[in-house]
Amino acid sequence: ISPLQRAYEQGIPVLTTDQYIGDGNYENGSVTFPLSVIASDNYEGGKIACTALIEAIGGEGSLYILTSTANVPSDIARRDGCIEAIDSVEGVTLVGVDYTESSAPIATNQTQAMLEKEPELKAIFGANLFSAQGAAAAIKSAGLEGVVKIASFDAPEQAIIDLRNEVIDMVIAQQPALIGSLAVQYAYDALMGNTADIPAKVNTPFVVITRDNVDTEEAQNAIYKSE
């Protein structure tokens, strides 16, 4: 926070994207000098992902969460949003939450261990890219594609390949292009002295990509493409 605070004190407008600082309430929270935070609502994203997973398994069965660490606010929010979705359905049981340290190989090992412990596992929520990649590798190795449903948070091209190959069943895409374009627009407005209409918080929407809609314009625009 300190470098951003110094920039602000030197008259440089500050906006944050993807992550907030302080408690995220820039109007009357613990940190108020940034003009705006432009980001996805990660709690809602986790809830959306696991609501879709629960529907995919028919509202019954066991669900496993993989996320990076217990210290990253975005991942904590996704985890907790997923847990809310699970708690709202009587037939679904949370069998565990593991932390992958953003390592796909660790996620693979953790998923393999969970499959041994819970052979009837029905669904996995990979709350970040590496967690989902590792889970997908374990499911593919076990020959359980389509049997264990996987929701992947974030939409790189590999996740879409896994989706098409029926290793992953749904991809929860943030919209980084939209986040970036809004940030540039608000930064320009701030430099021009037009700060009155810059919102203190913008939650950009998610796109849930499945095999049914992956080729639509909306889904294609949400995929994180390398070119």
Task: Place the predicted regions along the sequence by residue.
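A residue-level marker of the well-folded mature domains of exported/periplasmic proteins
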Residues: 1-227
